[in-house]
Amino acid sequence: MAESAGASSFFPLVVLLLAGSGGSGPRGIQALLCACTSCLQTNYTCETDGACMVSIFNLDGMEHHVRTCIPKVELVPAGKPFYCLSSEDLRNTHCCYIDFCNKIDLRVPSGHLKEPEHPSMWGPVELVGIIAGPVFLLFLIIIIVFLVINYHQRVYHNRQRLDMEDPSCEMCLSKDKTLQDLVYDLSTSGSGSGLPLFVQRTVARTIVLQEIIGKGRFGEVWRGRWRGGDVAVKIFSSREERSWFREAEIYQTVMLRHENILGFIAADNKDNGTWTQLWLVSDYHEHGSLFDYLNRYTVTIEGMIKLALSAASGLAHLHMEIVGTQGKPGIAHRDLKSKNILVKKNGMCAIADLGLAVRHDAVTDTIDIAPNQRVGTKRYMAPEVLDETINMKHFDSFKCADIYALGLVYWEIARRCNSGGVHEEYQLPYYDLVPSDPSIEEMRKVVCDQKLRPNVPNWWQSYEALRVMGKMMRECWYANGAARLTALRIKKTLSQLSVQEDVKI
């Protein structure tokens, strides 16, 4: 607007200057005579070969009248000369081409430069609406937040009150009992599925977290303390609620408890009034996973047999179906690998991470595959899983896939066996054939198309234990799942080997 005003003020000045000069052109036969307001010496008359002009405009608040001559050379552009243009609010200009035709009076321009338009002021109703709207919304948000927090706190305190008032809880959790005593008493006298839910809640809410010992896609694992004993606390992120619920559900299967399956203690959704934590409490094993253990240590022949036999025992118990009123369904792990097997103080294994496991209902011959987005570990997938030929309706198919993965775990263990001072560095299966994080397509090409398996060194034939291990591995890796060994057959073979090698289990 400022630029427009400047340009509009400049034009009248040009007109005044032009008027001062008289606008005279060269005299000639066809010269045009015009009235001239500034031509005192020629009796207010000028002569031109162009046009007569009359203009009235406002400048600095004053009205100015100009009559003058416009030379022909100044009449540009042709048809609409610059000097003949008008502006409704600032100036009124007229050009003509007859002698003294500019002796006319023009309409005075309507006003000065337009002031910038200001928006109209808000009325009282609008002002009230503008102020009251956000204030009301803010109060509404505060009330909703207060009600949500109050609800969570009521639920939290009610749970605490119920736990404190439950006499059976006090009876079970007498102060002279350790965690191990409690788990043993309840698992042997009850259904074999672990602690009652109210006891689980009480235990979980009296655990003191000490240090973080692991992280995964599900969340974190902490070492905690309860009544002088260590426990492992797996804390799931809220988006992994399905995984938490499924794993807790599997662990609480009737008659599941076994010395070679991770001891489940409690599951609880801890609500502290503002957010919910999903806890899964289990036995703590300081050696960590078999993967960590083999990376740190080599093993003797005795140690290798103990690790292999205990892993087979745990898997055989998972796969086994126990018939009866206190029976147990067959369970397939579906994600067996060295990172999901823990090593106990006594050098034995405990199978863990049952979040992907499936149970078989013998009565209806159905499998309860949970709606979980997690998938198994590609490196340990059996050929029939990689090429999608596995029969998902047949429970034995899942057990056969577990056996293939167990064979790979045995290969990891045997490589670290120190026999006659000879051992190999720890490596993952297929380390020399696929990248560190292989795709399903890369694994399928190696395992299904090329039918390759991890290398079994020839020098293992020099040691009976390693020879037996190598033979078992190959029988676990058959492309045809039905031809593979069963977990029970592997357990029996390793039991015989332990007797031959005089291994005390």
Curated annotation (Swiss-Prot):
Family per record: Belongs to the protein kinase superfamily. TKL Ser/Thr protein kinase family. TGFB receptor subfamily.
Keywords associated with the record: ATP-binding, Cell membrane, Glycoprotein, Kinase, Magnesium, Manganese, Membrane, Metal-binding, Nucleotide-binding, Phosphoprotein, Receptor, Serine/threonine-protein kinase, Signal, Transferase, Transmembrane, Transmembrane helix, Ubl conjugation
Comment field on protein domains: The GS domain is a 30-amino-acid sequence adjacent to the N-terminal boundary of the kinase domain and highly conserved in all other known type-1 receptors but not in type-2 receptors. The GS domain is the site of activation through phosphorylation by the II receptors.
Residues modified to Phosphotyrosine: Y380
Organism: Rattus norvegicus
Descriptive protein name: Activin receptor type-1B
A Gene Ontology term for the protein's cellular component: cell surface
Catalysed reaction, written as an equation: L-threonyl-[receptor-protein] + ATP = O-phospho-L-threonyl-[receptor-protein] + ADP + H(+); L-seryl-[receptor-protein] + ATP = O-phospho-L-seryl-[receptor-protein] + ADP + H(+)
Regulation: Activin receptor type-2 (ACVR2A or ACVR2B) activates the type-1 receptor through phosphorylation of its regulatory GS domain.
Active site residues of this protein: D335
Ranges where the GS domain occurs: 177-206
